[in-house]
Curated annotation (Swiss-Prot):
Primary site of residence: membrane
Species the sequence originates in: Thiobacillus denitrificans (strain ATCC 25259 / T1)
Cellular compartment(s): Cell inner membrane
Membrane topology field: Peripheral membrane protein
Domain of life: Bacteria
Protein role: F(1)F(0) ATP synthase produces ATP from ADP in the presence of a proton or sodium gradient. F-type ATPases consist of two structural domains, F(1) containing the extramembraneous catalytic core and F(0) containing the membrane proton channel, linked together by a central stalk and a peripheral stalk. During catalysis, ATP synthesis in the catalytic domain of F(1) is coupled via a rotary mechanism of the central stalk subunits to proton translocation.
Lineage, highest ranks first: Bacteria, Pseudomonadati, Pseudomonadota, Betaproteobacteria, Nitrosomonadales
Known partners and oligomeric status: F-type ATPases have 2 components, F(1) - the catalytic core - and F(0) - the membrane proton channel. F(1) has five subunits: alpha(3), beta(3), gamma(1), delta(1), epsilon(1). F(0) has three main subunits: a(1), b(2) and c(10-14). The alpha and beta chains form an alternating ring which encloses part of the gamma chain. F(1) is attached to F(0) by a central stalk formed by the gamma and epsilon chains, while a peripheral stalk is formed by the delta and b chains.
Residue ranges crossing the lipid bilayer per the database entry: none
Entry protein name: ATP synthase subunit delta
Length: 178
């Protein structure tokens, strides 16, 4: 995964700079997300992986599926990725673009994974705490993982706040082995 991240980073940064230059972060966010969705389709993925299909033909197909909203620069971006055999990086490019966009907008992306479904009030309380701690707006995604036993794990940026029972048990086991 880190290799994908490393390969995708220059493309994500280039698109981000272009979006900033055009003052169109939201538009480029939509374009990159659309492209990531297209290349994630199983039929398109098979086409991308097929060495018998020329790269320029794959690029044309993706541009066609994406539609007019892609624009000339978006189409050129697809062609560059295709020519360099990097179309499969689009989901990671999209993820990194969104992270850069959130940073530029002063927001953080967080994932809250809890052992049980959280009420909206609980989510709101956690978001308020994160906003206070990080002094930035926070966009959250909530997930449930019963294996946590109890509590929650919050991933925000490259930080992990593990308040789960499973995490506590693992730390105790490690300390006892110690």
């Amino acid at each position: 995964m880190s290799e994908l991240s490393t390969l995708a980073r220059p493309y994500a940064e280039a698109v981000f700079r272009m979006a900033q230059d055009e003052n169109d972060l939201a538009g480029w966010s939509s374009r990159v997300t659309t492209l990531a969705t297209i290349v994630s389709d199983t039929q398109v993925a098979r086409l991308i992986a097929d060495p018998a299909v020329p790269a320029d033909r794959v690029a044309e197909l993706i541009v066609s599926v994406a539609g007019d909203g892609l624009g000339e620069r978006g189409a050129n971006f697809v062609k560059v990725l295709s020519a360099n055999d990097r179309l499969t990086l689009l989901p990671e490019i999209s993820t990194q673009f969104e992270t850069l966009k959130a940073g530029a907008e002063g927001t953080l992306e967080a994932t809250i994974t809890s052992a049980q479904e959280l009420s909206q009030a609980q989510v709101d309380d956690l978001v308020a705490g994160l906003k206070a701690k990080f002094q930035r707006a926070v966009n959250v995604q909530v997930a449930v993982d019963p294996e946590l036993i109890g509590g929650a794990v919050i991933m925000i940026g490259d930080q992990v706040i593990d308040g789960s029972v499973k995490g506590r048990l693992q730390r105790m086991a490690f300390a006892l082995q110690g």
